[in-house]
Swiss-Prot record:
Binds specifically to cytosolic chaperonin (c-CPN) and transfers target proteins to it. Binds to nascent polypeptide chain and promotes folding in an environment in which there are many competing pathways for nonnative proteins. Heterohexamer of two PFD-alpha type and four PFD-beta type subunits. Keywords: Chaperone. The gene is pfdn2. This is Probable prefoldin subunit 2.
Length: 116
């Protein structure tokens, strides 16, 4: 690592730091979006779970409004919500890795953040 440390110029260090920080912010943004989606799915599930399973409902599929029953839609919505939760877990793991990478980089080059 010390050879790599010596090979990077100040501008390269700054750019690499900015890239790492940007990647971290992108992951945070995606987590936020997906958590919002999970919340919306939860609202829909709460709204329709007590309805009769043969009751008519509509769902947007690929930009087309499709008529289904609550019994058909509810399991699909729960499955989608659970899939999004898994994606959030993986993104949380990625965020932890990226944060550690960023902190290690800051420690290696003794970067001090000053507010502008």
């Amino acid at each position: 690592m010390s050879q790599q440390k010596q090979q990077l110029t100040e501008n390269q260090i700054i750019e690499h730091y900015k890239d790492l920080k940007s990647q971290q912010q992108q992951i945070i943004s995606r987590i936020s979006e997906f958590e919002s989606d999970v919340g919306e799915y939860g609202l829909v599930i709460n709204a329709i779970q007590n309805l009769e399973s043969n009751r008519k409902c509509f769902r947007m599929v690929g930009g087309v409004l499709v008529e289904r029953t609550v019994g058909e839609v509810l399991p699909q919505i729960k499955q989608n919500r659970d899939g999004i939760k898994e994606v959030v877990k993986k993104l949380d793991e990625n965020l932890s890795i990226k944060t550690k990478e960023l902190n290690d980089f800051v420690a290696l080059y003794k970067i001090k953040i000053t507010s502008q």
